[in-house]
Amino acid sequence: MYRTHRQHSLLSSGGVPSFIGGLVVFVSAAFNAQAETWFDPAFFKDDPSMVADLSRFEKGQKITPGVYRVDIVLNQTIVDTRNVNFVEITPEKGIAACLTTESLDAMGVNTDAFPAFKQLDKQACAPLAEIIPDASVTFNVNKLRLEISVPQIAIKSNARGYVPPERWDEGINALLLGYSFSGANSIHSSADSDSGDSYFLNLNSGVNLGPWRLRNNSTWSRSSGQTAEWKNLSSYLQRAVIPLKGELTVGDDYTAGDFFDSVSFRGVQLASDDNMLPDSLKGFAPVVRGIAKSNAQITIKQNGYTIYQTYVSPGAFEISDIYSTSSSGDLLVEIKEADGSVNSYSVPFSSVPLLQRQGRIKYAVTLAKYRTNSNEQQESKFAQATLQWGGPWGTTWYGGGQYAEYYRAAMFGLGFNLGDFGAISFDVTQAKSTLADQSEHKGQSYRFLYAKTLNQLGTNFQLMGYRYSTSGFYTLSDTMYKHMDGYEFNDGDDEDTPMWSRYYNLFYTKRGKLQVNISQQLSEYGSFYLSGSQQTYWHTDQQDRLLQFGYNTQIKDLSLGISWNYSKSRGQPDADQVFALNFSLPLNLLLSRSNDSYTSKKNYAWMTSNTSIDNEGHTTQNLGLTETLLDDGNLSYSVQQGYNSEGKTANGSASMDYKGVFADARVGYNYSDNGSQQQLNYALSGSLVAHSQGITLGQSLGETNVLIAAPGAENTRVANSTGLKTDWRGYTVVPYATSYRENRIALDAASLKRNVDLENAVVNVVPTKGALVLAEFNAHAGARVLMKTSKQGISLRFGAIATLDGVQTNSGIIDDDGSLYMAGLPAKGTITVRWGEAPDQICHISYELTEQQINSAITRMDAICR
């Protein structure tokens, strides 16, 4: 039973007495009767005195007063799941849910439109049906749903996905530590080969205290031939400012890149937080695509910092789970192949046209010092302010300014919602700069952005944009360089191996930049995407170009993909081009349908094939097998074998991943060049959370997380997750919760021990950004007992209510032959039985169970009520 107020009916099989059917029949008839209903006690017992007071059923009441955990449904949409107090309004009206004006307002009822609500006390039960015409409240006992129907005119007008701030939860106080370690050890058979060992550790630590979030992000790395190095990527104190729909940050952060280029800073910033907006009003996140020619290490950097690192198999890859440290700023993607060669390219990351809903104001104010990880740049103080306003007729007006010792900039822009023709924005920036050689420059930059979705054709122009800058235009970052040209090395980089992607020359300022991102759905024929960018410079013909194309389709159970990647950076003599063909085929379709491993469990097996050809005609081919194991599908392995036409060498790899309760682990082995180069790679990630109820180990943390507290429900699976269970105390952390959104947290009741019952199997939470929200589950660990009750040798009265002393939420009803079923009973206790309100209509059952009885599926026993 998953409700706070428990009323256990009796089992009807295996010789166990059942709740008398006559009561159900007559109660149902009573609800449909037009005249006053009366139950004849003689129908239930020959002796009417042996029947409890049934007056509540005569009034059409299916429940007794008390607190019930119910789903609240407003106009056929679930808006909340919580405890609701059901009270007796009057003897004539009977029992109803007590809904206060405050709770109705939080659900989305426009109480301000009805003055009668304002006249009620905040904690008083509001007569909804009397105040709002045509409104009704119905309690579905069988489904534990409180169904509220209100005319649409009485509902607040909110955007799709809106959750009222009254439901936002700041979470509990806690210490947080997330870690991610990866390493690789190379073994070379050649005596003159160097070792290629590398290690990388990322630590995300923090403290939550009320609405405040203290965070630190640090990394440790070591590679062969280099000393180990710690880096402090960022440290900051942050909190939500809910009345302003914004966020206050003190410490290290990044400015938004909507107007000016995103820069890293150390200081103070107050800015709007789009996470507080409904999903329908939010933008998009970057997706990084590419093609690896071998088992490769993928490193993604933003603003000079490594924000993502992983290992991929040969073929096309797509990374969509990047947690960027900034809302903007191009991403530098480095693909390090098994032979040590590195291919790099830049992926533009910008916002779609800067439109806001009418009346909305989006703001950001920053007072800080410029922060850099480059040895070529200096740090100086600057100020920045931006503002957007959603005007009438689908317009958005925006502007901003930057001020520093050697830099002044102001920009102004206007966006239009063109309806069926999409959305556009246009802005101009005027800047005055003083460079490293003390030369002064003035210039302008013009930008145009366009976005459109053609629903009829399935085409989505996620982003099309063009920026043109005059030769005298520079950015704030340009004025921070100590020299006019050079190679931009970050702390810890190998300065003996400069890369063109890190070369800068302030004489060659940016001129024009074109970028496009288009996707097209082809119905049952699949889909394709096209993305690209081109950056030109003043005083040179050199350009940066990136073009990516892909097509994916499904032919029955066969998944087929074709992709092409072209990239060229200025100074790079030749472009890098790679064409790839890949497919995957599920193998479990070939296995018996009756095989439990592939029907009732989360186990899958599939074969993959990847073929790629570069611009020099070199071909790589790989064939692989992947399978998931264990009941929860949290163990997987992958085996691949490949061939490279360049040098006619063979390569292969094998890896295994385990997603556990306390951590995620991975180990892999790969070889190339016919075995002359071999590498062992491994990774371990997880978290540690210290809170008022103890210390909990878990999987990797997200930005926002949920702590499950279910004492008594140890080793219970978390629904809709992989490898996630409660620990030996009944606690676990559910990572990657969505801030300011409804998060449904559920335990899998089927995985409970047989002597454990849950009052609530589902908890809905709405965390604020960075919060650790507590989701409490009330578990009753105890015996399931079927008692044959009596008092002075006579069975207890039919319909009497029995309640476990000290646990008012654990109750049951006496059956027609005096039987009582209750679950979650401790080894020893007292049960109070009532069959009326008079002082003599009560008795008590004292019981004591053996260990064998506690562990039994159901214990049958006689019980005397005194």
UniProtKB/Swiss-Prot annotation:
Taxonomy, superkingdom: Bacteria
Gene Ontology CC: one annotated term: cell outer membrane
Classification via InterPro entries: Fimb_usher, Fimbrial_membr_usher_CS, FimD_plug_dom, PapC-like_C, PapC-like_C_sf, PapC_N, PapC_N_sf
SUPFAM superfamilies membership: FimD N-terminal domain-like
Signal peptide coordinates: 1-35
Pfam families to which the protein is assigned, alphabetical: PapC_C, PapC_N, Usher
Entries under Gene3D superfamilies matching the protein: 2.60.40.2070, 2.60.40.3110, 3.10.20.410, Outer membrane usher protein FimD, plug domain
Keyword Amino-acid biosynthesis found: no
GO molecular function: fimbrial usher porin activity
Cell compartment(s), UniProt: Cell outer membrane
This protein's UniProt keywords: Cell outer membrane, Fimbrium biogenesis, Membrane, Signal, Transmembrane, Transmembrane beta strand, Transport
Membrane topology: Multi-pass membrane protein
GO BP: pilus assembly
Biological function: Part of the elfADCG fimbrial operon, which could be required for adherence to host epithelial cells. Could be involved in the export and assembly of the ElfA fimbrial subunits across the outer membrane.
Similarity section: Belongs to the fimbrial export usher family.
Family matches, as NCBIfam families: PRK15193.1
Protein name in UniProt: Probable outer membrane usher protein ElfC
Organism: Escherichia coli O157:H7
